[in-house]
Amino acid sequence: MTVSIALTICPEVKADEQPTLIKGFATAYNGPSEYTCTGKKVHEGICGGCEAYIGKTIILYQRLPGDQIGELIGIYECEDTGPGTEGFQQGYVIDVWCRNLEECQDFMNLIYTNNAQGRVWIQIVEECNG
């Protein structure tokens, strides 16, 4: 079965263009700091990733067995960096901020459904003018 998703984020994105997707993993975080590494106050919709993603929009989809695209997980602003591990530095791990540990667990449960095992497709939106 082939799944096709057309998602328009910006007016200049054409429906017939295939977005570039990166194979990766997602995690959830919560902590004592009220601010990201960029100085923004943490809030729902913030994620951490490699430094090259700072200021960009990150779209996460479940990555199902056979590398099929699963459900849309969410759309996030990358305003933080991860803990410095190889996955974060190389850009294949995204860390989604949650308000509390219960929300972290809910997020982890979501990304482990449909046998996705925490695997995600990462789409980086470079710029949105509109």
Model-found features: residue ranges?
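Bacterial N-terminal signal peptides
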Residues: 1-8
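Solvent-exposed, well-ordered loop and adjacent helix/strand elements within mature globular domains
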Residues: 13-130
